[in-house]
């Protein structure tokens, strides 16, 4: 089952982590680089990726960090989560970044580094 949170289209390379992301504390809004040493995508950039992660954590100010990522042209092309939290959903809506929520099975089947396409207007949302 796939649920659309923010509509849109995107195609790109998956950057996947099994760690929740704290956008306010862990992501550099100017570069998109992950600075959380506990995260398995430490020192990778979310810029121009299809960012796949379980859910967001931390302050609601993280929504503005997501918006800032877009303003600095360092944002992911789309986000895929297992659970929609208010911070990430709000940030994606503000920044107009497509966001979908997928089942655990779908999440587990998405491979890091794979090229994927998201089209929320299609019957097949995730290819």
Model-predicted segments: where are they?
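Feature captures the catalytic cores and cofactor-binding loops of soluble hydro-lyases/lyases
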Residues: 4-6, 10, 16-124
């Amino acid at each position: 089952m796939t649920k659309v949170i923010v509509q849109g289209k995107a195609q790109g390379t998956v950057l996947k982590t099994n760690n929740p992301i704290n956008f306010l504390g862990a992501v550099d809004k100017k570069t998109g680089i992950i600075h959380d040493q506990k995260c398995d995508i430490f020192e990778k950039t979310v810029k121009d990726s299809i960012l796949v992660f379980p859910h967001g954590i931390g302050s609601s100010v993280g929504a503005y960090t997501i918006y800032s990522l877009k303003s600095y042209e360092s944002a992911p092309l789309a986000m895929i989560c297992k659970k929609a939290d208010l911070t990430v959903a709000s940030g994606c809506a503000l920044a107009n970044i497509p966001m979908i929520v997928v089942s655990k099975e779908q999440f587990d089947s998405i491979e890091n580094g794979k090229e994927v396409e998201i089209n929320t207007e299609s019957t097949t949302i995730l290819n």
